[in-house]
Amino acid sequence: MKNKKAGMTILEIVKWILVALIMAFIIHSLMGNRVSKADFSTVWNAVTAKADSSKMQEGSNQMIRRLYGLDPAQFDEIRLDYPKTNMGAEEILLVRLKKTDDQEMVRTAMESRKKTQMNNFNGYGTYQYAMLEKSQIVIRGNYALFVSAENTAEIVQTFESAL
């Protein structure tokens, strides 16, 4: 009789753990799609204040199309800082989406750019390759960020705080 009660207790514990995990997943999913009302310029300025801007230049809409295959007209706002030289790997792309349905399209474009850059530096640009390995793509609701920098983690933290 005691074994049955102990078995029920373990089963109940497992059940509650599963319920807690499901709730945590749901909350995390909802928070990830939270639309931010943060001003784009404020977020951009916060992010770029943490980056080494001496190694980057501002990208035009044409450059965004060329490097990412994205049409800037599809988004509320989009801005790119990319390497000044072919040997640079520092890069920041910030996008404010018109609709969160575009998250996967933007993520795919960012992943493609990262892969292209890693292929470019594979075998000879070890410093740049390592930087790209640490680069991050972060999507939070209506904002998307791609960052490749020496201090990527710090820039991402600043981005998330600015939202």
Mark where each language-model region is.
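Soluble, non-membrane globular domain cores that form compact, hydrophobic packing
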Residues: 2-91, 97-163
